[in-house]
Regions:
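Alpha-helical transmembrane bundles and membrane-interface segments of multipass inner-membrane proteins
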Residues: 1-139
Length: 139
């Protein structure tokens, strides 16, 4: 069982670290409306999202943060009952993504704890702007 959870921990750590590094980079390089075009419709553009998926529910950050914590607890508890390595890795991805965005909500703010905005930066121009954490949750 412990060996299986090592995979979860690796997935979780990779998501949180990559997510926070890319968000730090975006805040440093994409301020003032700067857009970096990469390929075809892919570009990097800084967006601050105080809502949840697709910017819905803006302004309800503290409520969403509490709900996210409850979902994390549920996913971890559910994942603890699974024996499949792929399911345990998926739990690591989902929890890592949730924690990555929760870090933003908690600490990327000037208005108070849990009132921050999630930093999004990956813009395909035909889909809402996302970040590594959200991509990990969806995968």
């Amino acid at each position: 069982m412990i060996r299986r959870w090592k995979y979860c921990l690796v997935a979780f750590t990779l998501v949180v670290v990559c997510d926070q590094i890319t968000k730090w980079w975006a805040l440093e390089k994409l301020e003032n409306g700067r857009v970096i075009e990469i390929f075809w419709t892919l570009q990097f553009r800084l967006v601050r999202n105080t809502g949840i998926a697709f910017s819905q529910g803006e302004g309800f950050g503290p409520i969403f943060s509490i709900l996210i914590l409850l979902v994390i607890l549920f996913v971890v508890r559910w994942g603890a009952q699974m024996y499949s390595k792929s399911v345990v890795v998926a739990v690591g991805l989902v929890v890592g993504g949730a924690i990555g965005n929760l870090i933003d909500r908690a600490f990327r703010t000037d208005t108070g704890f849990l009132k921050g905005a999630v930093v999004d930066l990956i813009d395909l121009q035909w889909w809402p702007v996302v970040d590594i954490a959200e991509a990990a949750i969806v995968v």
